[in-house]
Amino acid sequence: MDEKELLKKAFKYGNVPSNITYCFTEPCPMKDKCIHYLSALYKNEETDRGDAIFPNALKNGKCKYFAPLRVVKMAWGFDKLFAEMKVKDAPSLRAEMRDYLGSKGQYYRYKLRQLKLLPEQQKYIKQLFARYGYKDVEFEHFSDEIDFTKI
């Protein structure tokens, strides 16, 4: 499934953030790759208000709000990460992960799929495990999804 189809599907099933910013600037040369413009095309018919990027944001063919439509491999689930670990390493690794993710509650949201890890977060966590000597660690679940972090 290509990026645009994934975005359409996200709107169809309501899997888009409520704070998305739409763009309706037809003459923009980057519109076919911009998540703001494509979101305006695929939004639900019931959506009749929201934040927008105004046409005057486009200057000399460039827009400072341009954000590319990007599909990323999201991850969640930590049980596999800790499966082969020495008991003595687990508490300190969990503590460092909680610190990185923001809190104990956030840690469990990522563990239980309420939140999903971006590739950058996955990389950091794998590097954290590597510092303890665990090189081939994997998360339990993955899915290809639209990156809504730059909206």
Regions found by a protein language model. Give the residues of each.
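Short C-terminal boundary/hinge segments that cap the last helix of small helical domains
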Residues: 132-151
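DNA major-groove recognition helix of helix-turn-helix/homeodomain DNA-binding modules
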Residues: 120-137
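Short alpha-helical "recognition helix" segments of helix-turn-helix
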Residues: 91-100, 107
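A short, Lys/Arg-rich alpha-helix, primarily the initiator
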Residues: 67-94, 135-137
